[in-house]
Amino acid sequence: MKTSVLLLPKTKRILETVGYQIKLARLRRNISSQLLADRAGISRATVWQIEKGESSVSIGAYLKCLECLGMAESFLNTAKDDPVGRMYQDAGLKNAKKGYK
């Protein structure tokens, strides 16, 4: 039996939002959950879990649904802007420069 990853409440809400957005995209295209499942090569139950934002579903299944809906490219924006990482990177570069004096 698969187990769900324990997520913080904020992270769980993000995953639920992604699932809801996938469901809206499917409904806007007038595609049944069974048809999406068939196209994605997953079960209808997995589509239902994705649309509920379940953390036990693989990221590959989420991406396959996005691909079937013509939205896989939107996944490329994930972590594209990383202000915190940039801050750490800049701080590290400043420290490295000080070491060379």
Residue ranges of predicted features:
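Short, basic-rich loop-to-helix N-cap that marks the start of a DNA-contacting helix
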Residues: 54-66
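A short, Lys/Arg-rich alpha-helix, primarily the initiator
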Residues: 3-28
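Short basic helix-loop element that most often maps to the first helix and adjoining turn
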Residues: 20-35, 96-101
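Short alpha-helical DNA-recognition segment
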Residues: 30-48
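Alpha-helical residues within the helix-turn-helix
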Residues: 27, 38, 67
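Short, charged recognition helix plus adjacent turn
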Residues: 76-101
